[in-house]
UniProtKB/Swiss-Prot annotation:
Organism name: Mycobacterium sp. (strain JLS)
Keyword Ubl conjugation attributed: no
Entries under PANTHER family matching the protein: SULFATE ADENYLYLTRANSFERASE SUBUNIT 2
Biological process terms in GO annotation: hydrogen sulfide biosynthetic process; sulfate assimilation
InterPro entries: PAPS_reduct_dom, Rossmann-like_a/b/a_fold, SO4_adenylTrfase_ssu, Sulfate_adenylyltrnsfr_sub2
Pfam families per UniProt: PAPS_reduct
Pathway where it operates: Sulfur metabolism; hydrogen sulfide biosynthesis; sulfite from sulfate: step 1/3
Entry protein name: Sulfate adenylyltransferase subunit 2
Record-stated family: Belongs to the PAPS reductase family. CysD subfamily.
Coiled-coil spans in chain: none
Molecular function per GO: ATP binding; sulfate adenylyltransferase (ATP) activity
Keyword annotations: ATP-binding, Nucleotide-binding, Nucleotidyltransferase, Transferase
């Protein structure tokens, strides 16, 4: 009796697309953290990367609810559209939101607001919130393509009892095996989007129909130029006497504190337009539009060593 012939599958028939492989990796990481840690939290600002991360986390546990809260480290200097999107997504998905306020730390005298940007002050607020809520793992939306300090950071990034990161003492990560071991007072930062690029993020947003704040798409806004960056006119960001204000079509590639987040001239008003624009860009979004990364060549690494995102 001869064995029945089984036809080989057509090439690519059972292969996952590039985006679905990234999605599967991120969901695996999120589930791994939920299984391994007692009190994880997802850092959620209402920006595109954290929205994608929340979308993946909801997918990871559907139809059940998200088994951990989300936390926003709030400088108080936010774009209104971003906060509105944050609150809407939290309400729609029945997620518990923890807001860690930089203003509270200023009022309590734990930090000094020397202005104009409160971005450096976020580290103190973040570490306080992690300590007070006894979080032992914190999901972040950082990607390796954004900045060179982030490029060398592990998916599971160990932080000591002071919240500090030592790039020379990182743990090996073999394939999809992650080491979350830590002692009381220490914690792990987890980056499920480490291997994604800005292009991947936008392609996934398009594929999944994810809604973002309107400032990510081209719109007309009064802006002024400072240190080679376009900054939006805002109650927390005003031009100097010698800086000319003009209106033009812009969009934001990344969103953070109003005082240090620039925009780029663009007419890309759809996901497809932005994907095409991103494909030919030669600057990362942080390199092009974040003043806080221009403090020094090692600005991001120095802040991460102190406990920054």
């Amino acid at each position: 009796m001869t064995a029945a012939h089984v036809a080989a599958p057509e090439p690519g028939q059972y292969e996952l697309s590039h985006l679905r492989l990234l999605e599967a990796e991120a969901i695996h990481i999120i589930r791994e953290v939920a299984a391994e840690f007692e009190r994880p939290v997802l850092l959620f600002s209402g920006g595109k990367d954290s929205i994608v991360m929340l979308h993946l986390a909801i997918k990871a546990f559907a139809p059940a609810r998200l088994p951990f809260p989300v936390m926003h480290v709030d400088t108080g200097h936010n774009f209104d559209e971003v906060i509105a999107t944050r609150d809407r997504l939290v309400a729609e998905n029945g997620v518990r939101l923890v807001v860690a306020s930089v203003q509270e730390d200023i009022d309590a005298g734990r930090v000094v607001d020397n202005g104009p940007s409160r971005n450096p002050l976020q580290t103190v607020t973040l570490l306080r919130a992690i300590r007070e809520n006894r979080f032992d793992a914190a999901f972040g939306g950082a990607r390796r393509d954004e900045e060179k300090a982030r490029a060398k950071e592990r998916v599971f990034s160990f932080r000591d009892e002071f919240g500090q990161w030592d790039p020379k003492a990182q743990r090996p990560e073999l394939w999809n095996i992650y080491n979350g071991r830590h002692r009381k007072g220490e914690h792990i930062r987890v980056f499920p989007l480490s291997n994604w690029t800005e292009y991947d993020i936008w392609a996934y947003i398009g594929a999944e129909g994810i809604t973002l704040p309107g400032i990510y798409y081209a719109h007309t806004r009064p802006v002024f130029q400072r240190d080679g960056m376009l900054l939006a006119v805002h109650p927390y960001m005003q031009p100097r006497d010698d800086e000319e204000v003009f209106e033009t079509s812009v969009r934001f590639r990344t969103v953070g504190d109003v005082t240090c987040t620039g925009c780029v001239e663009s007419t890309a008003s759809t996901v497809e337009d932005i994907i095409a624009e991103t494909a030919v860009s030669r600057l990362t979004e942080r390199g092009a539009t974040r003043a806080d990364d221009r403090i020094s060549e090692a600005g991001m690494e120095d802040r991460k060593r102190e406990g920054y995102f």
